[in-house]
UniProtKB/Swiss-Prot annotation:
Binds 2 Mg(2+) ions per subunit. One of its GO terms (cellular component) is host cell cytoplasm. It comes from Escherichia phage Mu. This is Probable terminase, large subunit gp28. The lineage of its organism: Viruses, Duplodnaviria, Heunggongvirae, Uroviricota, Caudoviricetes. GO terms for biological process: provirus excision. Gene3D superfamilies: 3.30.420.240, P-loop containing nucleotide triphosphate hydrolases.
Length: 551
């Protein structure tokens, strides 16, 4: 493993383990004799398992019912691959599951097939512990070595960068339940360059899950993936319940088979859950709060809402304050000023913000509220790695030019308090809401955001990042909030974490504020340092001298 690139450090050399003892410690039920899983004179694999085993497509996806034994069949295929010499297509295989128990169950199946296929390997199982310097935690991996071929099968954690620098086939198990599936697939697909395959196996986890989106892309002809669909009824027709009866030493009968199948459906929490778990029908709501259809219906068909991006160059912080100010001022006048000048004075305007200093994005979303109370995104500003002062500069440039500005809501969590306070000092608490993002806040305001979509009362920019960010809103313990996953920005250069979704929700919250309307006379009545047009004012700069040491 390329540990330097992956920020993983081996804590000890690989050591051989007793598979039964390890399984006992983790409470995993394993089979160590192929005769326990295969009746005499019957094929090892059931029909759907055999079809999956034999599929040589470079990218294969299986949407399946629970506990149909597809990973077991995949283990047999992987042993064949790793045991062959390179000249016959042999290579390493890397398995990515979401839990240690899954990894051990898979490795146990690989060991079973390695022994069953005779002299292909000694089938010893090894473990090795690595220290993840990013997550500050230990990661345990299991491995089977094949001395004749020189290849191995290794079970890794689901951290995407673990695949960087590796070469071999990749198996992603229960893919729909990985937090960073998009990053994981990106890392896995890179291995295709040298002929390796990617095998993706999962039960569904909602219609808006990336796993389902990949399946739809394949079925609609946009991707060249091979897709297998294995419902519980498909598996039963191919002999699953008969095989279960053999392994568990129960008598089989058609009546018992029907009762078993009907009991699974009857005892599911509800019909939608049963259809998803056993029928390969993803829930319409899934974990996502806003459906893809609902989001796309709110997107402007004319593509006339611009998304403006400013990413500070690498040497930005080494420039003088005057140079940074000049660069940003030029950008504001070239990019923002024409859009601000074009805003209608007949509409009220509010703004929502999501803050980040490094890594994620700061997003400003101005909303126009028309006389008939419809809301429309005016434009969007996305800032990456921009200094605090220049974020303030851009913010005040916008706020001071919004016609009939009535309020703004800011993410004041952590360092976000800086921008929120800067705006509040100028416009006052009646106009600026400084918000600490909590489950209680999400529970109150996310439903109002959803209501705007359901009432078709909001128009937003038509862009892939719009969709990606809004799909990050997931229901967790009954509360709609931003999930832990991340997506790549346009061009794949930076991370996103639902930044636009938070900013848009903030803007909707600002639309409920009752601040007075800021007009030209009001602006001129403010003291000079409160107008937002004199960012070099000494008094205001002195106020923020704490910035360098405080953040």
């Amino acid at each position: 493993m390329n540990t330097r690139e992956n920020n993983l450090k081996a804590l000890h050399a690989p050591r051989k383990i007793n598979l039964r003892e390890e399984a006992g410690l983790l409470g995993v039920d394993i089979v160590t004799d192929i005769g326990e899983a295969q009746p005499r004179n019957e094929p090892v694999f059931l029909g759907y398992q055999r079809r999956w085993f034999e599929d040589e497509s470079q990218i294969c996806i299986a949407e399946k019912s629970r506990r149909t034994g597809l990973t077991w069949a995949e283990a047999g295929r992987n042993v064949m691959t790793a045991a062959k010499p390179k000249r016959r297509g042999g290579r390493n295989v890397f398995y990515v599951g979401s839990r240690q128990e899954m990894a051990l169950e898979y490795i146990a199946a690989c060991a079973l097939f390695a022994r069953a296929f005779n002299q292909l390997a000694k089938a010893d199982v090894w473990e090795q512990t690595f220290w993840d310097s990013d997550k500050k935690e230990e990661i345990l991996t299991y491995m089977i070595r094949f001395p004749n071929s020189g290849f191995k099968i290794q079970a890794l954690s689901s951290r995407p960068s673990n695949l960087r620098g590796l070469q071999g086939d990749v198996v992603i198990d229960e893919a729909a339940f990985h937090e960073a599936l998009d990053e994981l697939l990106k890392a896995a697909f890179a291995l295709n360059m040298w002929g390796a395959s990617v095998r993706i196996i999962s039960t569904h986890n909602g219609v808006d899950n990336l796993f389902n989106q990949y399946i739809q892309d394949a079925r609609e002809g946009r991707k060249d993936y091979s897709v297998h669909r294995i419902t519980l009824d498909d598996a039963i027709a191919d002999g699953l319940y008969r095989r279960i009866c053999y392994v568990t030493n129960q008598p089989w009968s058609p009546e018992a088979e029907k009762a078993w199948r009907d009991g699974l459906y009857r005892n599911a929490p509800n019909k939608e859950s049963a259809d998803e778990e056993y029928g390969c029908i993803p829930k319409k709501s899934g974990g996502a709060y806003l459906s893809r259809v609902l989001i796309e219906a709110a997107m402007t068909p004319a593509r006339d809402i611009p998304v403006l991006r400013f990413e500070a160059p690498d040497d930005f912080e080494s420039l003088t304050p005057q140079m940074r100010h000049g660069i940003v001022q030029d950008w504001c006048e070239q990019e923002l000023l024409p859009l601000l000048d074009a805003l209608s004075p007949l509409n009220k305007h509010v703004l929502g913000e999501d803050f980040a200093r490094r890594g994620d994005l700061t997003v400003f979303v101005p909303l126009a509220i028309t006389p008939d109370l419809r809301k429309r995104e005016c434009f969007r500003v996305e800032l990456r790695n921009v200094t605090y002062d220049q974020q303030r500069q851009i913010l005040l440039f916008i706020l001071s030019r919004l016609p009939r500005f009535t309020g703004a809501a800011f993410d004041a969590t952590g360092n976000g308090g800086y921008l929120a306070e800067a705006a509040r000092l100028i416009y006052g608490p009646e106009m600026i809401d400084c918000i600490s993002l909590t489950p209680a806040w999400y529970q109150e305001w996310m439903p109002k955001l959803k209501g705007e979509f359901e009432a078709q009362n909001i128009t937003i920019a038509r862009h892939q990042t719009t969709l990606d960010d809004l799909l990050h809103i997931k229901v967790d313990k009954g509360i709609p909030q931003i999930d832990k996953g991340r997506t790549k920005d346009e061009g794949g250069k930076g991370r996103r974490h639902g930044d636009f979704a938070v900013a848009l929700c903030m803007a909707v919250r600002a639309s409920y504020m009752n601040g007075f309307v800021i007009d030209e006379d009001s602006i001129q009545a403010l003291p000079p340092r409160h107008r937002g047009d004199d960012v070099d004012n000494d008094d205001f700069d002195d106020y923020h001298q704490f910035e360098r040491g405080g953040w």
